[in-house]
Amino acid sequence: MRIGTTMPNNACITIAVCSRNRPQQLHAWWAHIGTIAGSDTTPILVIDQSDVAPMIPRAPNLTIMHRPGRGLARARNLALAHATTPYIAFCDDDCRPDHDWLTAITTVMHQHPEVALLYGAVWPSGADYQLHHHHTHAGSTVWASRRDGLVCSALRVAATPSHYTTPVAPLECLGQGNNLIVARAAVQQWGGFQPWLGAGAWLQAGEDVEITLRLLSHGAVCMYEPQIRLRHDAWQTPDSLMATEHGYSVGMLAVHVWYALKGVDVAREYLQFRFNTAKKTIGARDETHRRSRTFLWARGWALAKGIIGGVSLWLVGWTKGFPKIS
């Protein structure tokens, strides 16, 4: 399926950021975006769900939509509905794209106009850090640590491009939503982001994973390109990251329970891996792997909520379908 067309950058891509009650991050993001090649002629869309409207300098190519509320998936759908370009490039307000980010996106889109979802590389901000790989059933995910004890997650540093048309593990094989380019034609055909998923929603995460599995299930082209690079400036304490990971677990489990019930093999493989890992954690006897009772309760609640959410999504999916993007 031919998704896009060959056209100049400023008519091809809209940059979109979704933010809520993070004025400092949004100001820093806006100041940085102006340094990117081609950003002065590229439409920029800010979906702000803050309690108070953002006060950032205006520009002719900037549109701010202030919609107080919660829900990253809902905000992404607003961006998809409002944008008029064939592609929407999403990044988070704590991400800093490289100078040639737009150029790299445009190059891939011209070479592969059939692509429905395109993921880019996400590196930690700064220079004095160490990368760590967490091995899973489908490869590995990456996080970083600094000497001051802070850590950074939601990274993707693979050096090799990838190209898929059947379901794979999205995080290990493609990337995540903090550096994601979406073809509007694809979501017009197969629907937008599921609003129960993602930050601010009751299932807390996984909206990017779900839409990737859905499009791949339809045979759409999803790609990863390491030259489309940005830096993730989201350093936090290990305790803070652990709390974040509990939320991620809810969304990830919900998505994979849902898709396992739909018969998607990669979802079943993920669930088998997660439950085997959970059994090892609960049964650990040595001090190195033993977890506190507080951790086990929090993770157990996340597992239960994710399972309930996945079954609920499966049931609702039969009747309501997916958000329509016109």
Question: Which residues does each predicted region cover?
Answer:
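Short aromatic/hydrophobic "clamp" motif used to bind/position activated sugar donors
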Residues: 88
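Conserved donor NDP-sugar-binding/catalytic core segment of glycosyltransferases
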Residues: 100-147
